[in-house]
Design a protein with these regions (language model features):
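Active-site core of metal-dependent hydrolases
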Residues: 1-49
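Conserved strand-to-helix beginnings and helix N-cap segments that scaffold or border functional pockets
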Residues: 23-24, 49-53, 119, 157
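His/Asp/Glu-enriched, well-ordered alpha-helical/loop segment
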Residues: 28-112, 128-130
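Short, positively charged
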Residues: 74-76, 111-119, 172-174
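C-terminal cap of metal-dependent C-N hydrolases
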Residues: 102-160
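Short, solvent-exposed cationic patches
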Residues: 160-174
Length: 174
């Protein structure tokens, strides 16, 4: 009640909560009470993958398991991940597509065997069916940064090689 009354936002990080055994956030109750609720991946120390699409599906399934019919719908989870998270950050120009807003979005082709039927409920697809792998296109502030699943402004292979070298150096410090 205090969170709702004070306008305090909650960043829900279910994968981190599971990894750290820190419990299950009472998201269905928070949503009913009008608590501003977003979805986040926390950080690499407590969420090795930092994959927001995975976080959406995990949030959906976790609350279905824990809260059954009171659980947020797949579309509710999408709204938490987009508008909800933007609102918590005080960034009302983010989290939805509209004229004059930042054009940040991604696109995936539904022409994949694992997404068959997804076109009939696109608002719930990411939470209910889930999506693994690289998205087909990502646009940030109106500029394409991922095309056909690959970063367009950097050489991924070089980044991976440099990152792996840095990890090896950190792991084998003597």
């Amino acid at each position: 009640e205090l969170l709702a009354a004070t306008g305090t936002g909650v960043a829900h990080c279910p994968v981190s909560n599971m990894k750290l055994s820190s419990g299950i956030a009472r998201i269905p109750e928070m949503l009913r009470m009008g608590v501003k609720t977003g979805l986040a991946v926390d950080g690499s120390a407590s969420n090795d993958g930092s994959n927001m699409l995975e976080e959406m599906r995990v949030a959906y399934l976790l609350h279905r398991l824990n809260s059954s019919s009171e659980a947020p719908s797949g579309y509710d989870i999408l709204k938490m991940a987009s508008r909800g998270s933007a609102s918590i950050l005080g960034r009302e120009e983010l989290g939805h597509l509209a004229e004059g807003m930042a054009a940040d979005f991604f696109a995936i082709s539904l022409d994949r065997i694992e997404l068959v039927g997804g076109q009939y409920d696109p608002k719930s697809l990411l939470s209910c069916i889930g999506f693994k792998g690289a998205v087909d296109y990502t646009v940030v502030n109106g500029k394409v940064v991922v095309e056909q699943g690959r970063l367009v402004n950097v050489e991924e292979e070089k980044i991976v090689s440099r990152a792996n070298a840095a990890v090896e150096k950190l792991l084998y410090i003597k």
